Amino acid sequence: MNVRNLSTGLKTFVILKMLLTSGVIERNGTIILDEPEIHLHPEWQLLFAELIVLIQKEFGVHVLLNTHSPYFLNAIEVYTVKYGVDDKCKYYLAFSKDDISNIEDVTDNIEAIYSKLARPLQDLENERGQL
């Protein structure tokens, strides 16, 4: 199979499989994913999130990921509980205040992340209300 001929979304899954089968993902290692859901349909986002959680559970890896997708975030939240690894999961929110970048642990208040992700849609709804 030539990876170049696949859609960007499928490449995400194929690359993950290649990392697994080649032994690149090691026990207690670290995986860094920057917006892995970016080219995925919402249904595939859920599947990819489940795979990431299962890999974390099986290999005990540390997963650092960044997302702007409420679907993906919610899937991570649900699957970490489903597979009993929610105690290993932390949630952080990045924000700027007074021109200083901050990262806050919001594990006990994940709603803060959802609220920030929902803001653009709320702004659009406000615009619609003014039409």
Which ranges hold each PLM region?
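Switch/communication elements of ASCE P-loop NTPase nucleotide-binding domains
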Residues: 1-125
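Short acidic DE-rich linear segments
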Residues: 128-131
